[in-house]
């Protein structure tokens, strides 16, 4: 496996990680996340191999914004009415850490838990 195996629709379903959407909304609002929601999200993420996990989270965040008529590079809060964008991005980027699922950060095979590309989602 490797980064070339990470195409949306191939490495993960599109829309990506439907089970993680409620987790993201609850977490960025500072709400308590029910165990079942956490379990669903982490299971969906665990079903995706290490390389594409961040891509799947990026795709999920992207589609949540786009469904509310926001394109990359534009500010929009429709998807997350009471969350600041920085919080949304960092929360999404940390879902792998919340689930304790490793990701591959670079080609050297270094593993970590936070998806930097998701945290850097270009929306502002």
Swiss-Prot record:
Expression (tissue specificity): Endosperm.
GO molecular function: alpha-amylase inhibitor activity; serine-type endopeptidase inhibitor activity
Reported modifications of this chain: The disulfide bonds are essential for the inhibitor activity.
GO CC terms, sorted: extracellular region
The organism's place on the tree of life at top rank: Eukaryota
Subcellular location: Secreted
Pfam families attached to this UniProt entry: Tryp_alpha_amyl (PF00234)
Function: Alpha-amylase inhibitor.
Record note on quaternary structure: Homodimer.
Identification of the protein by name: Alpha-amylase inhibitor 0.53
């Amino acid at each position: 496996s490797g980064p070339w195996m990470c195409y949306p629709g191939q490495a993960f379903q599109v829309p990506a990680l439907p089970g993680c959407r409620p987790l993201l909304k609850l977490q960025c609002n500072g709400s308590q996340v029910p165990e079942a929601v956490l379990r669903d999200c982490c299971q969906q993420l665990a079903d995706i191999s290490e390389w594409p996990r961040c891509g799947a989270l990026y795709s999920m965040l992207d589609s949540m914004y786009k469904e509310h008529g926001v394109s990359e590079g534009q500010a929009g809060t429709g998807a997350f009415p009471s969350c600041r964008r920085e919080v949304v991005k960092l929360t999404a980027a940390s879902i792998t850490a919340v689930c304790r699922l490793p990701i591959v950060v670079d080609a050297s095979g270094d593993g970590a838990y936070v998806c930097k590309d998701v945290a850097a989602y270009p929306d502002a």
